[in-house]
Amino acid sequence: MGKQPVKLKAVVYAISPFQQKIMPGLWKDLPGKIHHKVSENWISATLLLGPLVGTYSYVQHFLEKEKLEHRY
C-alpha cells in the first residue's frame, strides 16, 4: 500500500486591527532622524543637486532667450 497524503494546516500571519503599536520605532524622534541624515549627507546632496539646478536654470534661461529672439 502507498503512503496517504497528510493534510497540513496553513499558518496565517495577520496583524490585529486592534493592535495600535505596529511599528512604534519608525515614527519615534522623526525630526531628529531627518536632521541627522541631512547633516550627515549634506555634501553629497549639494554635489548632486548643484549641477541639476544649474543645468535646469541654464536651460530655462536659454529657452526664454530663444523665445524673445524669435518674437519679432
Swiss-Prot record:
Residues 60-72 are mitochondrial intermembrane. It comes from the Eukaryota. It is a single-pass membrane protein. GO terms for cellular component: mitochondrial inner membrane; respiratory chain complex III. It is found in: Mitochondrion inner membrane. Pfam families: Cyt_b-c1_8. The chain crosses the membrane at residues 42-59. Its main location: mitochondrion. Residues 2-41 are mitochondrial matrix. Keywords: Electron transport, Membrane, Mitochondrion, Mitochondrion inner membrane, Respiratory chain, Transmembrane, Transmembrane helix, Transport. One of its GO terms (biological process) is mitochondrial electron transport, ubiquinol to cytochrome c. Component of the ubiquinol-cytochrome c oxidoreductase (cytochrome b-c1 complex, complex III, CIII), a multisubunit enzyme composed of 3 respiratory subunits cytochrome b, cytochrome c1 and Rieske protein, 2 core protein subunits, and additional low-molecular weight protein subunits. The complex exists as an obligatory dimer and forms supercomplexes (SCs) in the inner mitochondrial membrane with cytochrome c oxidase (complex IV, CIV). Component of the ubiquinol-cytochrome c oxidoreductase, a multisubunit transmembrane complex that is part of the mitochondrial electron transport chain which drives oxidative phosphorylation. Belongs to the UQCRQ/QCR8 family. This is Cytochrome b-c1 complex subunit 8. It comes from Solanum tuberosum (Potato). The lineage of its organism: Eukaryota, Viridiplantae, Streptophyta, Embryophyta, Tracheophyta.
